């Protein structure tokens, strides 16, 4: 990554280390039973999985081409650094290592593409375009995590939890819900009820059957924050 001042174009590049720190913060928020933290972690995990599949598929296509050269008698090795740098890594959440996996996959893919260019299997422009498009997708993912940390870690939203959405919640809780929904939209029902969960979460709340039914009703819009049944006919009409 680069800071805004270090970038020749005047904008910063979000590093994998920065994204790992953002995801650690959101992972910590999941301990508060925060549905938006769960939603973000699920989204990022899914997108990382998709990107890794794309890297594997595209890289394998190129690798197969190189293997054909070897079958014809030309032994080709994928490029690697003459002086590889060893870095000791340590992350305080599983999501840091998830980002490392993505970066490792991209590093391998980039070396395969550069090998293809060097061995005349791809042209210079094709190779640069392939790397540019893949880099663009990964950067888009990295950049997309920043607003979540910016807003969810604010003092006004830091205490947000599923209980804020339930009937009888305090005025402060309702304000947190209104702000979160206004910024991020409604949490998908499967995330809100816990049917779909992050791969790694600090959530430890045990939900009773009655509480689960209430969460489902709120997620489906059957009950409002005041506890009213929204399907009930209004007798004043």
PLM ranges: what are they?
Residues 106-116:
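Non-transmembrane amphipathic alpha-helical segments
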Residues 1-102, 108, 134-237:
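Polar/charged low-complexity regulatory segments
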Residues 121-122:
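Conserved hydrophobic residue
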Residues 125-126:
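Short, solvent-exposed positions on alpha-helices
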């Amino acid at each position: 990554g680069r800071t805004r001042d270090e970038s020749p174009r005047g904008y910063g590049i979000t590093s994998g280390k920065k994204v790992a720190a953002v995801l650690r913060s959101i992972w910590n928020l999941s301990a508060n039973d925060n549905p938006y933290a769960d939603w973000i972690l699920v989204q990022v995990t899914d997108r990382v999985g998709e990107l890794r599949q794309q890297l594997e598929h595209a890289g394998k296509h190129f690798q197969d081409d190189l293997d054909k050269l070897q079958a014809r008698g030309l032994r080709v090795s994928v490029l690697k650094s003459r002086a590889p740098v060893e870095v000791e890594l340590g992350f305080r959440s599983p999501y840091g290592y998830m980002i490392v996996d993505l970066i490792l996959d991209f590093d391998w893919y980039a070396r395969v593409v550069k090998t293809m260019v060097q061995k005349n299997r791809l042209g210079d422009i094709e190779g640069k375009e392939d790397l540019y498009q893949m880099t663009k997708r990964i950067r888009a993912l990295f950049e997309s995590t920043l607003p979540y940390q910016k807003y969810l870690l604010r003092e006004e939203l830091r205490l947000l939890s599923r209980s804020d959405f339930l009937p009888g919640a305090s005025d402060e809780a309702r304000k947190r819900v209104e702000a979160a929904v206004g910024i991020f939209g409604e949490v998908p029902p499967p995330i809100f009820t816990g049917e779909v969960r992050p791969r790694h979460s600090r959530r430890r709340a045990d939900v009773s059957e009655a509480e689960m039914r209430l969460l489902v009703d709120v997620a489906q819009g059957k009950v409002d924050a005041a506890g009213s049944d929204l399907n009930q006919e209004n007798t004043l009409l």
